[in-house]
Amino acid sequence: GELDAMLEAMVQTILKQSGSISPASFDAIEATLDAYLGPLPQEFEVNGKTVTPIQWRDQLGIHPSEYVSLTSFTHHPFGQEFILEVPDNHAHGAFLNVPLDDLEATVNNALDQGYTVAWDADVSNKGFSFRNGWAIMPETAKTSEEWKTLDAMPAEPTVDQAARQRDFDSQSTTDDHLMHIVGRAKDAQGRSYFIIKNSWGDGNAIEGRQFVSMEYFRHYTV
């Protein structure tokens, strides 16, 4: 859109300048964002009370230093942090690398302890259906018509560390979307799913939520 084009032109102009970046450049970018989006609020109202952003942060009791970002890939050693090589990791954030089984167990343990989990995953494959409220990994490929008439969860392959790594290396698995794991469920066959909240509104079969199969989670978590 217009804002993207404006910022892109400004950033490219700044990058072409030799020497250090002028502080005025940052002021210009901030002024542009303010013009399009409005300035950052200095205070706002919550439950009838006026608070500053810092006051609201402190009231929530969230301590970012107590949270850890996890991933699971074999091109780096397990038990160590590394900067995940995906385009959206603009801040070069480090992730603790753990075996796939440990990653799944950690999410289950967090849910057992009453916590929820921020989840980053590939959502660009045919097994991810927001409209139907599921994210599954069928053992055999489905046609578009078969997806439309699917009335039971199909069999899924067992996902291991090697299969997951293969699709990440080939870029079949991509860094697409962040969601929120809030619970678990089982289907009539006893298969387990994570319940996620998506940010795409509530206009699907289950009010904006989705059931993510364990195999989908193991394969497509970034």
Can you name each region flagged by the protein language model?
Residues 1-11:
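Extracytoplasmic mature domains of secreted/periplasmic and thylakoid-lumen proteins
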Residues 2-3, 21, 25:
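Non-membrane alpha-helical secondary structure
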Residues 10-21, 29, 161:
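Acidic, His- and aromatic-enriched active-site or binding-groove loops in soluble protein domains
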Residues 27-33, 37-222:
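Active-site signature of cysteine proteases
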